[in-house]
């Protein structure tokens, strides 16, 4: 997919992710990446999908994300650590989004687990597909693009003809926020409750100036 020049960079990222979701022919969640665009094959984990999209839509921004020396790409907790480290007047192309209500299409949301164990997920990283909405209890629901081991709410993944039980897809994740509106916990799937973990949000933008709205 070629860049759509009239769109902002976050919107271009989201368009790339949506293209993958809409055109995949095979997908499963796995740590060993196997992606073949021509065949529509996207077998990867969450950071594999994010890396694949960013390398194509925003390679200079992707290069800013730190990775471990023994890993081919940044894992989920590295996105969390990087976004958390950003200051309000950052001019390095990435901007931290503090409030859930300020999330926009193309933003990247990441969280990390307390313990980083060899051979296990370190957290999760995903693209926001659209602006969050709130429910009567004040929780936020965000449609996302990601690669996941199980479907989220109202998800393109699942059981049934033409669906895949894991891998790349789009669905809704719910978030709780604190009194200031910062995300504090997430509900990943209908079978799970809210899980409190450190959450951080990043947005690509110019390499100087402020974040794009």
Where are these regions (language model features)?
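Alpha-helical structural elements
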Residues: 24, 72-78, 88-89, 106, ...
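...with weaker cross-activation on analogous glycine-rich loops/strands in unrelated enzymes
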Residues: 68-153
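Low-complexity, compositionally biased segments
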Residues: 21, 25-26, 39, 48-50, ...
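N-terminal capping segments
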Residues: 1-74, 195-213
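Context-gated lysine
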Residues: 64-67, 78, 96, 159, ...
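Arginine residue identity/basic-tract feature
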Residues: 28, 56, 73-75, 104-105, ...
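Low-complexity, polar-biased intrinsically disordered regions enriched in Pro/Ser/Thr/Gly
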Residues: 33-37, 118, 136, 186
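Low-complexity, Gly/Ser/Thr/Pro-rich intrinsically disordered linker/tail segments
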Residues: 141, 147-213
